[in-house]
Amino acid sequence: MVKARRQAKILELVRTRVIETQEELAAALAAEGIPVTQATISRDIKELQLTKVPMPDGRYRYALPEEPGAAAGERWRRIFREAVLTIDHSGNLVVIKSLPGTAQGVAAAIDHAGWPEMIGTVAGDDTVIVVVKPADATGEVAERLKGLMR
């Protein structure tokens, strides 16, 4: 039970605070009445699949895997930002123009997002078509995708 309580507290701390190091995490846990060793912290970080993600100031903090700034998600966003040139939509389709040879990566990034309104992607060399359902959500999906370009 102690491990479950400790790991739940770690998740809470990582969600609510900027924790940059294992030492900071250990200190935060100790302040909550949960003393731990560095080895325990290290095991918990691995089991909880915490990752380090960059902050705007260049420092890194621990994050949960599903957080928007987490490692895999950040890689997909970076691919999207660097490759996408334009986004437009018509009917239930969003058309994305990208740099030559990057459409497959862009489509994979979109698929990774897992938005329920996007039912599939088709990628060529420099164009991705996103099929949206329901059709009246297409404009919103296009705007959300444009937001990933920033």
Swiss-Prot record:
Location in the cell: Cytoplasm
Cysteine disulfide links: none
- State the NCBIfam families in the record: argR_whole (TIGR01529)
Give the protein's function: Regulates arginine biosynthesis genes.
Source organism of this protein record: Symbiobacterium thermophilum (strain DSM 24528 / JCM 14929 / IAM 14863 / T)
One Gene Ontology CC term in the entry: cytoplasm
The family assignment reads: Belongs to the ArgR family.
> Gene3D superfamilies in the record, alphabetically?
3.30.1360.40, Winged helix-like DNA-binding domain superfamily/Winged helix DNA-binding domain
Which keywords does this chain's UniProt record carry? Answer: Amino-acid biosynthesis, Arginine biosynthesis, Cytoplasm, DNA-binding, Repressor, Transcription, Transcription regulation
One GO molecular function term of this record is: DNA-binding transcription factor activity
The question of whether Transcription is a record keyword is answered with yes
Q: Which residues form a coiled coil?
A: none
Specify the protein name. Answer: Arginine repressor
**Ranges that cross the membrane:** none
Predominant subcellular localization, coarse grouping: cytoplasm
Q: Which gene encodes it?
A: argR
Its pathway, per UniProt, is: Amino-acid biosynthesis; L-arginine biosynthesis [regulation]
**Superkingdom of the organism of origin:** Bacteria
Tell me which Gene Ontology terms the entry assigns under biological process: L-arginine biosynthetic process; protein complex oligomerization; regulation of arginine biosynthetic process
